[in-house]
Amino acid sequence: PAVGLGSWITFNVGDDPKLRAECRAVMAAFFGAGGGMIDSSPMYGSSQAVIGDALAKLGRPPGLFSADKVWTSAANGPAQIAETARRWGVGRFDLLQVHNLWDWERNLDTLEAMKAAGRLRYTGVTTSHGRRHGELETVMQRRPPDFVQLTYNIVDREVERRLLPLARERGIAVIANRPFQRGRLPDRLAGRPMPGWAREIDVSTWPQFLLKFILSHPAVTTAIPATSRVDHLRENKSAALGPMPDAAIRRRMAEHVRDL
């Protein structure tokens, strides 16, 4: 499992040169730490353009895994995808996802045709905030994409019941979004002492603790925390290092957070 980089809110900084430089520094640190997947969407304001500007200045690293979304009707999808590629400055995406299942059947037609023509590596569909799980399950059963993106963290665990087992069964890669509940979980845990047994899995901070829980689920491929700070980026990336919790420690982790 790996730690990717989300861009919701944190990279929506407009044309501000100082804030763009901060985002560029985060991306440089991300690639320097071996990072690959960067995820964005047309819904995320200026995030796509900020990513593209940073890639133009940093140079496109060979390990980049470019992930974006189509967030419109199928009729408008090709034009939106072309604009997204222009903003990123890429000729071909590694992954394009149907954002929040918008017109998913026809948008998947578009993405599957792009993949068949060699213009796209992988297809995906997304949901978030625990919504529309039944519909996502239908997609996974009827037209399994290469990737699904869904909300999963140490508190929001509904997907453990059906969607994560189904992803393993169907060979679908899983991207976990909202790993920190948009910062609420680290804020809630800040100042609380780390349990001594966390040393067994090389954890010393709460963000590491939260990410290791997610990454250790056997169905999860990557988690995509978003940040605009280099120190937080490095802390997040470190969660993929060292031993991962087994099933018994995962239960202990969830119980510990629940009881705090």
Residue map of PLM features:
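Hydrophobic packing residues within well-ordered alpha-helices of enzyme cores
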Residues: 51-54, 111, 136-139, 167, ...
